Amino acid sequence: MPRKGPVAKRDVLPDPLYNSKLVSRLINKMMIDGKKGKSQTILYKSFDIIKERTGNDAMEVFEQALKNIMPVLEVKARRVGGANYQVPVEVRPERRTTLGLRWLVNYARLRGEKTMEERLANEILDAANNTGAAVKKREDTHKMAEANKAFAHYRW
């Protein structure tokens, strides 16, 4: 924690092609070793693949996919009297988006397609259709929260 008070939260600049902060954040999430140009190229090619396959606007498909991935509930560990409980808590909107983007990129990387463009495009398309590993992660997170509903009164 800084001694000089709270650190101001930086706002990302919108992406130049789609004029969207979400796209900028996805580019930053995908970036490895500071290679932003490469990350941008991969994302734009993925969006081209999505547009080609669906015929719809890639941005709309991406937003729908993200909506299907973002969790509403998650569990946090809380120590009470020597026992650790998994306490279900609601996810803040900012964290929802962050988790959604993180899961999208992570599960796209784990896919078996040859190029990252194809992997990302297919993961976005799967998520838009409510299938795929990222959506399964959200479902698992919700199941954990549901299973531990009995400990909800330990919320802080």
From Swiss-Prot:
Database matches in PANTHER family: RIBOSOMAL PROTEIN S7
Record-level Gene Ontology MF annotations: rRNA binding; structural constituent of ribosome; tRNA binding
Protein name: Small ribosomal subunit protein uS7
Subunit text: Part of the 30S ribosomal subunit. Contacts proteins S9 and S11.
Function: One of the primary rRNA binding proteins, it binds directly to 16S rRNA where it nucleates assembly of the head domain of the 30S subunit. Is located at the subunit interface close to the decoding center, probably blocks exit of the E-site tRNA.
A Pfam family per the record: Ribosomal_S7
CDD domains: uS7_Bacteria (cd14869)
Alphabetical GO biological process terms: translation
Keywords assigned by UniProt, alphabetized: Ribonucleoprotein, Ribosomal protein, RNA-binding, rRNA-binding, tRNA-binding
HAMAP family in alphabetical order: Ribosomal_uS7_B (MF_00480_B)
Residues forming coiled coils: none
PROSITE patterns associated with the record: RIBOSOMAL_S7
Family: Belongs to the universal ribosomal protein uS7 family.
UniProt GO cellular component terms: small ribosomal subunit
Ribosomal protein among keywords: yes
